[in-house]
Curated annotation (Swiss-Prot):
PANTHER family (UniProt xref): PSEUDOURIDYLATE SYNTHASE TRUB1, TRNA-PSEUDOURIDINE SYNTHASE
Top EC class, one word: isomerase
Annotated protein name in UniProt: tRNA pseudouridine synthase B
Disulphide bonds in the chain: none
Gene name tied to this protein: truB
Length: 301
């Protein structure tokens, strides 16, 4: 997808960054603030430092829709090592145990993957950002404290084995995963290894999609530094993410002033736009009236 030129005075929009490894999501936000010359900037969905791939950045008023993106489905390409467990459930942790996976058959791996597909309850990773008594779980884990997190419902729509390589007592498998928000791929690696009685951890992770935004729209930080550009304007992003409802002039004014409309009969959130395709607000039908989810263009603008 072509990107929209950005520079001083550019409008609000979305930038899809291909996050490099060895950077935190916060580091990427800091770099983008310098590139785009604004502090009003945020991201949707944290990626671990070792992970690469899609990180959606909202600029200026586009930060208003980031919360809606965090709750959407995501896709990943990952490599899982069977036969070793680590303290962080990924390659950055200390080795905890090694159990030979030499005897594990591909059919057993496929069966264990199938058991972890669909609606499941997953215990989040102990080194997650979930808060426990006001502190992040990963902070407690790094201090050597035992972290017990409750299992949560998640949905794994696709968990597919793409390749398998045998090494000395370990098996490396490449997988692709489509999942709901709140799914921890590290926890999938942990649980897959546990199901096979050999342990497992994540050795690489690349996010390939967040909602409607994927790697085909992504730019590297170096590319953005050379040519700052939006992946999509705020209007384009809203119309890509949600169904469209066309408004009359009077309806546009009402929505811009925060007044409800007659329902549209559209399930979920939809983008209410004027005749020029400018999104006035994201709305939801509630009973006999609409409810504003996000007002994109208030009447005061």
């Amino acid at each position: 997808m072509s990107r929209q030129n950005a520079g001083p005075g550019f409008g609000p929009g979305i930038v899809v960054v291909d996050k490099p490894g060895a950077m935190t999501s916060h580091d990427v936000v800091g770099r983008c603030r310098r590139i785009f010359g604004t502090r009003r900037l945020g991201h949707a969905g944290t990626l671990d430092p070792m992970a690469t791939g899609v990180l959606v950045i909202g600029i200026e008023r586009a930060t208003k829709i980031l919360g809606l993106l965090i709750a959407t489905s995501k896709s990943y390409a990952a490599t899982i090592r069977l036969g070793q467990t680590t303290s962080t459930e990924d390659a950055e942790g200390e080795p905890l145990a090694s159990v030979s996976a030499e005897h594990v058959a591909p059919e057993a791996i496929a069966a264990a993957i199938l058991d972890l597909t669909g609606d499941i309850r997953q215990v989040p990773s102990a080194v997650s950002a979930i808060k426990v008594d006001g502190r992040r779980a990963y902070q407690l884990a790094r201090e050597g404290q035992t972290v017990e997190l409750a299992a949560r419902p998640v949905r794994i729509d696709r968990f597919e084995l793409m390749d398998l390589r045998r090494g000395a007592d370990v098996i490396d498998i490449d997988v692709e995963v489509d999942c709901s928000s709140g799914t921890y791929i590290r926890a999938l690696a942990r649980d897959l290894g546990a199901a096979l009685d050999v342990g497992g951890h994540l050795t690489s992770l690349r996010r390939t999609r967040v909602s409607h935004f994927d790697l085909s729209q992504a730019a590297s930080l170096d590319e953005l530094a050379e040519r700052p550009a939006l992946s999509l304007t705020l209007d384009q992003a809203c119309l890509l993410m949600f169904p469209r409802r066309d408004l009359t002039v009077d309806e546009s004014q009402s929505v811009g002033n925060g007044r409800p409309l007659e329902p549209a009969g559209i399930d979920g959130i939809y983008a209410a736009s004027d005749a020029d395709g400018r999104v006035i607000a994201l709305l939801r039908d509630e009973g006999r009236r609409t409810k504003s989810v996000v007002v994109i263009r208030p009447a005061t603008m």
